[in-house]
Amino acid sequence: MLYALICTDKPGSLAARKANRPRHLAYLKSLGETLVLAGPFTESDGQTMNGSLIVVEAASIDAARKIATNDPFARLGIFASVDIRPWLWTMNNPGKEA
């Protein structure tokens, strides 16, 4: 099943996010095919990152939670919150027709 990890940064954490982004990206890359898609949320300027959307394939919500908990941004306290929700990829899914 797919799970969307909707991660919101703590206010004032942009410097820590930028400094630790290589670790975060390396962690996401290490997930291999478990990672479906990922990218940062931004402020209205389209540049200033303030959170992340990460979609993973996991056997259960507990497995998705473990992935979220092990993210360096979570371990370093950059995320204020992580909402984990089951997700159905309906449109533009390269693996299935709608």
What is the predicted function of each stretch?
Residues 1-98:
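Conserved, structured core segments of small domains
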